[in-house]
């Protein structure tokens, strides 16, 4: 049975005991509203580690002034049931006041990796992500931490944070989990209308078009971006916010493609903003 831990102090006590006995800890940080994408990471951790910890914490620091922190879906009872079914040992669900008992005296600034793509549209977002992940790593002290490749920019930033701050954790990137028709699983999909849900499948189809162009030898980013944009414009009613080609994990905008690349999409429907990506090319 999955145990619910609600305080930092109790979580640290459990972790210290586990470390003394040589127990390996796998960790999946989440903001809740869990779906199959999260559960895939939990299953991976359960198959590899002695203890699997899932955090459910809606982090206020990664919400901007025009983003509604209070409206973010919270369903801790359902989340607890879901992770129990796939074998998680602990759900860590602290209060905001416990994670941030006072005003932070040190601001974390991510730098260039956060100045592009999602970071450019949501200033301060990745500073908040890195702050909370840093704190969670210090509390849970995992041997392995699991992040989805759907948030590929976040994954690149967390990997850089681990390197820069010498965290003794290995980051495991988990492939995007998709619906049968190709739509990337996301907590935001529930906000799509029936028509938008039918259209949303074309995000992944446009990425497959980009991949096909690349495999056919196309190396001009503008050509790929234009073709993907044209495809989306003819298949969806949502507003196309971004179609971009960047190196990965360096996140440098590419004009003439060389090496490994990251093709990123962002589309705003009436009540849901969806992102998707594909990583292709040699390392």
Curated annotation (Swiss-Prot):
- One short Pfam name that applies is Pantoate_ligase
Q: Where in the cell is it found?
A: Cytoplasm
What does UniProt list as catalytic?
38 (proton donor)
Cite the binding residues for (R)-pantoate: 62, 154
User: In which domain of life is the source organism classified?
Assistant: Bacteria
Which SUPFAM superfamilies does the record associate with it?
Nucleotidylyl transferase
- Tell me which EC number(s) this protein carries: 6.3.2.1
Reaction catalyzed: (R)-pantoate + beta-alanine + ATP = (R)-pantothenate + AMP + diphosphate + H(+)
UniProt keyword terms in alphabetical order: ATP-binding, Cytoplasm, Ligase, Nucleotide-binding, Pantothenate biosynthesis
**Is Cytoplasm included in the keywords of this UniProt record?**
yes
Pathway named in the protein's UniProt entry: Cofactor biosynthesis; (R)-pantothenate biosynthesis; (R)-pantothenate from (R)-pantoate and beta-alanine: step 1/1
Q: What is its main location?
A: cytoplasm
Kindly give the InterPro entries that the UniProt entry links to this protein.
Answer: Pantoate_ligase, Pantoate_ligase_C, Rossmann-like_a/b/a_fold
One function term, GO molecular function aspect: pantoate-beta-alanine ligase activity
What are the binding positions for ATP in this chain?
A: 31-38, 148-151, 177, 185-188
Keyword Cytoplasm included in the entry's annotation = yes
GO cellular component terms, A-Z: cytosol
Q: Which annotated residues bind beta-alanine?
A: 62
Q: From its record, what is one biological process in GO terms?
A: pantothenate biosynthetic process
Q: What does this protein do?
A: Catalyzes the condensation of pantoate with beta-alanine in an ATP-dependent reaction via a pantoyl-adenylate intermediate.
Kindly give the PANTHER family that the UniProt entry links to this protein: CYTIDYLATE KINASE/PANTOATE-BETA-ALANINE LIGASE, PANTOATE--BETA-ALANINE LIGASE
Q: Which family does it belong to?
A: Belongs to the pantothenate synthetase family.
Self-association state and partner proteins as the record states: Homodimer.
Q: What else is known?
A: The reaction proceeds by a bi uni uni bi ping pong mechanism.
The name this protein goes by in its record: Pantothenate synthetase
Q: Which organism is it from?
A: Staphylococcus aureus (strain MSSA476)
């Amino acid at each position: 049975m999955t145990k619910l831990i609600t305080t930092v102090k109790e979580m640290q006590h459990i972790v210290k005991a586990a470390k003394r006995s040589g127990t390996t800890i796998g960790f999946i940080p989440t903001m809740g509203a869990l779906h199959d994408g999260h559960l895939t990471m939990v299953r991976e951790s359960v198959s590899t580690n002695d203890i699997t910890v899932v955090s459910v914490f809606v982090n206020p620091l990664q919400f901007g002034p025009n983003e509604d922190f209070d409206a973010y879906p919270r369903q801790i009872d359902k989340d607890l049931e879901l992770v129990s079914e796939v074998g998680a040992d602990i759900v860590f669900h602290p209060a905001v006041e416990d994670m941030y008992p006072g005003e932070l005296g040190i601001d974390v600034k991510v730098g260039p990796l956060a100045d592009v793509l999602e970071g450019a549209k949501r200033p301060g977002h990745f500073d908040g992500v890195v702050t909370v992940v840093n704190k969670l790593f210090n509390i849970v002290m995992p041997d392995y931490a699991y992040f989805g490749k759907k948030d590929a920019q976040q994954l690149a930033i967390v990997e850089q944070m681990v390197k820069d701050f010498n965290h003794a954790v290995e980051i495991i990137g988990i492939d995007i989990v998709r619906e049968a028709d190709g739509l990337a699983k996301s907590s935001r999909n529930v906000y799509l209308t029936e028509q938008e849900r039918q259209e949303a499948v074309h995000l992944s189809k446009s990425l497959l078009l980009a991949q096909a162009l690349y495999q056919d030898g196309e190396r001009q980013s503008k050509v790929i971006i234009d073709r993907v944009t044209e495809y989306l414009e003819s298949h969806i009613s949502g507003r196309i916010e971004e179609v971009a080609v960047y190196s990965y994990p360096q996140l440098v905008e590419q004009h003439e493609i060389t090496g490994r690349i990251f093709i990123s999409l962002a589309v705003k429907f009436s009540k849901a903003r969806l992102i998707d990506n594909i990583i292709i090319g040699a390392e």
